[in-house]
Amino acid sequence: MTDEAEDSGPGGYAAARLRLLTEGARSGPPRRRALAELTDGWLAGLFGAATEEHTGISLVAVGGYGRGELSPRSDLDLLLLHDGRDDKAVAALADRLWYPVWDLGIDLDHSVRTPQQARKTAGQDLKVHLGLLDARHLAGDLGLTASLRTAVLADWRNQAPKRLPELRDLCAERAERQGELQFLLEPDLKEARGGLRDATALRAVAASWLADAPREGLAEARRRLLDVRDALHLATGRATDRLALQEQDQVAAELGLLDADALLRQVYEAARVISYAGDVTWREVGRVLRSRSVRPRLRAMMNGRNGGKPVAERSPLAEGVVEQDGEAVLARTARPERDPALPLRAAAAAAQAGLPLSRHAVRRLAATARPLPTPWPAEAREQLVTLLGSGRPTVQVWEALEAEGLVTRLLPDWERVRCRPQRNAVHLWTVDRHLIETAVRAAGFTRRVHRPDLLLIAALLHDIGKGWPGDHSVAGETIARDVAARIGFDGADTAVLATLVRHHLLLVETATRRDLDDPATVRAVAQAVGTEHTLELLHALTEADALATGPAAWSSWRGSLVADLVKRVSGVLAGEPQPEAESAAPTAEQERLAVEAFRTGGPVLALRAQTEPPADSAPAPSSPSSPSFPSPLSSPSSPSSADGPEPLGVELLIAVPDQAGVLPAVAGVLAMHRLTVRTAELRSVPLPDGVEGSVLLLDWRVAAQYGSLPQAARLRADLVRALDGTLDIAARLAERDAAHPRRRGVEPPPPRVTVAPAASRLATVIEVRAQDAPGLLFRLGRALEAAGVRVRSAHVSTLGANAVDAFYVTRGEGTPLPGDEAASVARGLEESLRT
């Protein structure tokens, strides 16, 4: 210890502490031990300077400090233990200990108790009891500290049947509140499931002698999380356990890792080890407690049949697999070394029965099972399909296989996606867990398709290409071909699986970003899919993939668009005649709105909550001649109350005399009223014979971001002002943004605007990918107006914080843009979004 550290004063300790944290070794156990030892010496010096009495009183470290796990900004958990002597003298001693800690700005969790008080408090407060399990003597009466440790540990073991269920419930409640560490983009290293608190809970279970946690990899997982927390404290200068996005690169650099993705992957791997150990441990705790509550033979008699005879302790599930005490285990006659399909058979049997696969069984399979031949025998492939088709129980069984490395042994390509983060707020899961979740969802659709096996394998493989650079669909197609052949599919089935993986995004992207009335759109999808059976599989895979992604990726609105596209493509594949591309004639309602707009010289608004209005009714227009339009855009019958986070919304029809600036004006007014645009179409409507002039008709589907939708009359009034220039939409939106600034985390990727070649024969398709923000469509509309192009239709899609929009644009006379002009418009749009 340095001379400065030997100085019991705050200055000496502070200097030595600073030197250790800034000039010492990187984050890791040696530095944590050194920091704990340095702090121990300082506190012992404070204790010695504050009192000459060393009997009947001691200073004790508890909790994380008791374990010697001091991170740079950790608080100090201290207990001043005394034998009940003069309270004033003890209080004075406590002040002489606590104030120097506070003077250095170190957080302190402190208490002053007798051993009896400490035990009583521990009996009433589970968290206090957990902290005392890690009690460590610092100074004073060693015997007093040792006696407390012995008593607290004895209490813990005696009370384990009561305390462990409380601890299990505490862990479950915390997991529900904080989420799972292994899937969060900004995880709490301490509180989330699989974090440091769960690791501490497993130590407490082991201390009870009632059950023990799996030890393989657990200490290493805990060390990794502690190392990350150390680096996080140094990077932020704060006592935080939340690994925020903006700190991840700096933390990765502090740990010598390549980048933030490598950091998250290490964190996820550690959390997965701790989570799985927790699952196994708590199952064992439950088993032991059940066995203590009822004698085994009595329990067997109570559950028995045949005149009360005891039932067998083992029930067969499959060849070589039995159920025992709520788990799937290997039969006594099982020989993994002679049965290469046994790992998959055991996993499938466990999942089908809704049982966890015993850890002992998995370890034995991993240690002794022979590798499968290539190609796999039919039984192995069928067992994999059975496992994937078991629904929700598949997840825990797959995690058991993963914990012992069996998944990557069966599917080597899995290693590239294992624990791989997805830096997209839309995704709830890592890549590998998303693939399993997709299979779980697909299991519910197996009655919709003619080949459930192909659907389930495609679900497992559809994002496998994310472990390689480039377009993951293209990379995934190659991997899918290799995997399909390796596991025993024939050439035809392999081709179908490759098509499903290559085009797993085709339906949803086309349905939400393309004009489905354009025959070229439908023909392109039909050409890519090839057959009706493949289309059927792709439809089910699309929905399963989206549902497994997260709530922002699927809704009744998206589902209806995809179903419409599938119906049209199915017609093409069936050889049904397709209509030629032409502008649809206006309906009677649209023509009526156009005439009203021309007559009044201003915009006319109408709404339609249903997809199709009743034949004998039409929505009343909102115009100067009908000022009493009373109802808001929402109504009890509106599909906005449909299930899913994205309601269909309402159809908003706007007719306005042809003039410049209509698109940005409408988009801006809708943004002002916090309306989300689902789809947008704009076209010129000819007036009846004998009437000169033209009217623009905008057919948009909108929904409120939150709250109720505004009155149509309010929308019309603001639109009139926007069109005549008396309403400065840009200023209003800027004013609102300034009044409610959004917290910024990491800098989002820059916007990207591209031209989609050959996407339509009717128009040029310009795709925009950008960070979603209020008024984005308004800004795009202004830029398109400035470019002098006409917008035929817009297809708007928002996924989490990402906007993916497609605009069908033409020249003024209605023809597609030449290539160079289209590229120039795209560049202009991109520049407008960057400024």
Swiss-Prot record:
Q: Where is this region: Uridylyl-removing?
A: 317-650
Keyword terms of this UniProt record = Hydrolase, Magnesium, Multifunctional enzyme, Nucleotidyltransferase, Repeat, Transferase
Segment Uridylyltransferase: which positions?
Answer: 1-316
Boundaries of each HD domain copy? Answer: 431-554
Do you know which SUPFAM superfamilies this protein is assigned to? ACT-like, HD-domain/PDEase-like, Nucleotidyltransferase, Nucleotidyltransferase substrate binding subunit/domain
| A Pfam cross-reference name | ACT
Q: Could you tell me one molecular function GO term of this UniProt entry?
A: phosphoric diester hydrolase activity
Identify which cofactors the protein needs according to its UniProt entry.
Mg(2+)
The UniProt record lists the keyword Transmembrane: no
SMART domains listed in its UniProt record:
HDc
Compositional bias annotation for Low complexity: 631-642
Q: What is its EC number?
A: 2.7.7.59, 3.1.4.-
Domain ACT residue range list: 651-736, 765-835
Q: Where is the composition biased (Pro residues)?
A: 621-630
How activity is controlled: the entry says: Uridylyltransferase (UTase) activity is inhibited by glutamine, while glutamine activates uridylyl-removing (UR) activity.
Q: Which GO terms describe its biological process?
A: regulation of nitrogen utilization
InterPro entries in the record: ACT-like_dom_sf, ACT_dom, HD/PDEase_dom, HD_domain, NT_sf, PII_UdlTrfase/GS_AdlTrfase, Polymerase_NTP_transf_dom, UTase/UR
Q: Where is this region: Disordered?
A: 610-645
HAMAP family membership: PII_uridylyl_transf
Protein role: Modifies, by uridylylation and deuridylylation, the PII regulatory proteins (GlnB and homologs), in response to the nitrogen status of the cell that GlnD senses through the glutamine level. Under low glutamine levels, catalyzes the conversion of the PII proteins and UTP to PII-UMP and PPi, while under higher glutamine levels, GlnD hydrolyzes PII-UMP to PII and UMP (deuridylylation). Thus, controls uridylylation state and activity of the PII proteins, and plays an important role in the regulation of nitrogen assimilation and metabolism.
**What domain notes does the record hold?**
Has four distinct domains: an N-terminal nucleotidyltransferase (NT) domain responsible for UTase activity, a central HD domain that encodes UR activity, and two C-terminal ACT domains that seem to have a role in glutamine sensing.
Query: What family, per the record?
Result: Belongs to the GlnD family.
Official protein name in the record:
Bifunctional uridylyltransferase/uridylyl-removing enzyme
The source organism is Streptomyces coelicolor (strain ATCC BAA-471 / A3(2) / M145)
